[in-house]
Design a protein with these regions (language model features):
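ABC ATPase NBD Q-loop/coupling interface
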Residues: 65-87, 125, 196, 337-359, ...
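Short, glycine/charged-rich "phosphate-handling" switch motifs in NTP-dependent
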Residues: 225, 237, 494, 506
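Conserved ABC ATPase "signature" region
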Residues: 128-147, 341-344, 399-416
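Charged, flexible cofactor/metal-binding loops and thiol motifs
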Residues: 3, 74, 146, 240-280, ...
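A short, proline-enriched helix->beta-strand linker immediately N-terminal to the Walker B motif
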Residues: 171-175, 440-444
Length: 579
């Protein structure tokens, strides 16, 4: 029996340049999931966009076949007229994208946008379309379909936006769904729920799924067949059991080595708490109008150590980072203390004079999630690295240039790059440059806000290696912000898990992973996709911990919005619980 979709020797190029996708072949059967795996620039997204012929204007299909089995006929989508192709897009073949806000109009109600799919491809009235859309909303997990129908995209959370995109793509019951990094921009528990939803829809409808991803953990949980791509070519392909169980190509092995996993720790030997701290948040609260973003956070960073705050969007972790650096003020009664050395007196970051703040900013710096936030596209690298020195009047022009060269060497880059602009560098190189800029003033503390989340897995591993190396060589302390427990398990000495502005559990990563107590911590661990087909995501655990705090088990439940206290459940292990 022929495959539902067969792509053979597909070659795509831009202008007269060499091919960006070169002789790529793959196929997917009805009811099957095919994963296209690779890092940024591998050609996986371009290959899938070619199926629906939604390539960038300057790109064209140079050769190859894209054959779709449609109602008993073979249709070569690469050569189909635009008029006939419009009848297939959204009907027989649908696609969902990484960022739903780019696909959902903010000017039109969600229900009207999805109804349009049915009025275009089905002979039905708006009233009939609405009923089908409401049924699809309920199917994809909206608790109140009528409200979702009337909502605008910006009124929904990221997870709900992606559910709306899935509803739009599946409402016409396509034979093939292409999902391009559908969960990359989502929190861990939301990602797990969306992956579970896709599997459920596929099982019920029998549709085929092409899943584009860079995450081998997602592949292990979803795929029947795997195609690994790099630089526009297929490196390896086969069943998920074969490719994930015994990868043959060096590039596939490299992806596996770089994939973040939550280690299986033994219960650790008890360690004494460090008495000396460099940073300490005391009873920190922050409200924005009626929203309590941070509520009673107490957290200290021991000198020379890494303390991580883990949580999902809206947990308050980034607000804590900004308050720690004095970029935002905590509510009255909250304090942030900084100690330059064990012998020095602590200063309150929240009440510094302008001169004191200027001095503090030399000693505490931030590394951002997106290096574009800290590197001006109009500045050469030498200017970006010497600007902090110039602002704080450090050294002569020659000394600043020497410092810039030294900084590049510290982050593993070459001095020949000084006269380049940021757009000449890869994402990983730009993050190295951001770290170099943060180190320019020889700080004692780095606050790292999701420094690896925007990077491919192999580059992510390199940046974590760099941060560990710099910490050891320069005796730095880190406050490390992340949504990924696998990342912090690797780098942190202590982890605080936040949910809706409160710390719900705090311990060493070894203790937290070996003996998690809070349902939300367990949900974060369960939601992390492991690159192992024998360790699937536990959706029941995810649903239990990711729900509303008032629905948690009795020992952890909030009552009328009032949280249980954060107690020392055992030595060096804090849990927010009534028990």
């Amino acid at each position: 029996m022929p495959s539902l979709l067969s792509v053979k020797d597909l070659t795509i190029g831009f202008g007269k340049n060499k091919p960006t996708v070169d002789q790529v072949s793959f196929s997917v059967d009805a009811g099957e999931t095919l994963a296209l795996v690779g890092e940024s620039g591998s050609g996986k997204t371009l290959s899938c966009r070619a199926i629906l012929r939604i390539l960038p204007n300057s790109a064209d299909i140079r050769s190859g076949e894209i054959v779709l089995q449609s109602r008993g006929n073979d249709i070569d989508l690469a050569r189909l007229s635009e008029r006939k192709l419009r009848g297939i897009r959204g009907d027989r073949v649908s696609m969902i994208f990484q960022e739903p806000m780019r696909s959902l109009s903010p000017l039109h109600r969600i229900g009207h946008q999805i109804s349009e799919v049915l009025t275009l491809h089905r002979d039905c009235s708006m009233a009939e379309a609405k009923q089908q859309v409401l049924a699809e909303f309920e199917h994809v997990g909206f608790n109140d379909p009528e409200r979702a129908y009337r909502a605008y995209s910006f009124e929904l959370s990221g997870g709900m936006q992606q559910r709306a995109m899935i509803a739009m793509a599946t409402v016409a019951k396509p034979a093939l769904l292409i999902a391009d990094e559908p969960t990359t921009a989502l929190d861990m528990t939301t990602q797990a729920q969306v992956l579970g939803l896709l599997k459920k829809l596929q099982a019920e409808s029998g549709m085929a799924l092409i899943l584009v991803t860079h995450d081998l953990g997602v592949v292990a949980n979803m795929a029947d067949q795997v195609v690994v791509m790099n630089k526009g070519r297929v490196m390896e392909s086969g069943s998920s059991n074969l490719v994930l169980g015994a990868p043959a190509h060096p590039y596939t092995k490299k992806l596996f080595q770089a994939a973040p996993v939550i280690p299986e720790f033994e219960r650790p030997v008890e360690q004494p708490k460090a008495a000396d701290f460099i940073l300490s948040l005391r009873d920190v609260r922050k409200t924005y109008g009626a929203i309590q973003a941070v509520d009673g956070v107490n957290l200290s960073v021991p000198r020379g150590k890494v303390v991580a705050i883990v949580g999902e969007s809206g947990s308050g972790k980034s607000t804590c980072a900004r308050i720690a650096l004095g970029a935002e003020l905590a509510n009255p009664g909250g304090h942030v203390f900084f100690k330059e050395s064990p012998e020095a007196d602590a200063i309150d970051v929240q009440s510094l004079s302008p001169a004191e703040r200027n001095d503090f900013q030399r000693k505490a710096q931030m590394v951002f999630q997106d290096p574009h936030s800290s590197l001006s596209p109009r500045m050469q690298i030498i200017d970006a690295l010497t600007e902090p020195l110039d602002i704080h009047s450090v050294g002569t022009v020659a000394e600043r240039r020497d410092r810039a060269i030294e900084l590049l060497e510290q982050v593993g880059l070459d001095s020949s790059m000084l006269r380049r602009y940021p757009n000449a560098f890869s994402g990983g190189q730009r993050q190295r440059l951001s770290i170099a800029r943060a180190l320019a003033l020889r700080p004692l503390l780095l606050v790292c806000d999701e420094p690896t989340s925007a990077l491919d897995v192999s580059v992510q591993a390199q940046i974590l290696d760099l941060l560990e190396d710099i910490r050891d060589r320069l005796n730095l302390s880190y406050l490390f912000i992340s949504h990924d427990l696998a990342v912090v398990a690797r780098i942190a000495d202590e982890v605080a898990v936040m949910r809706r502005g409160r710390v719900v559990e705090q311990a060493s990563p070894e203790l937290l992973m070996a003996n998690p107590k809070h349902p939300y911590t367990r949900a974060l661990i369960a939601a992390h996709p492991e690159p192992d087909i024998h360790r699937p995501i536990n959706l029941e655990t995810v649903a239990l911990g990711a729900g509303d705090p008032e629905s948690w088990p009795d020992a952890f439940r909030y009552t009328d919005g009032v949280a249980p206290p954060l107690i020392e459940y055992e030595s060096n292990h804090l849990v927010r619980t009534h028990v």
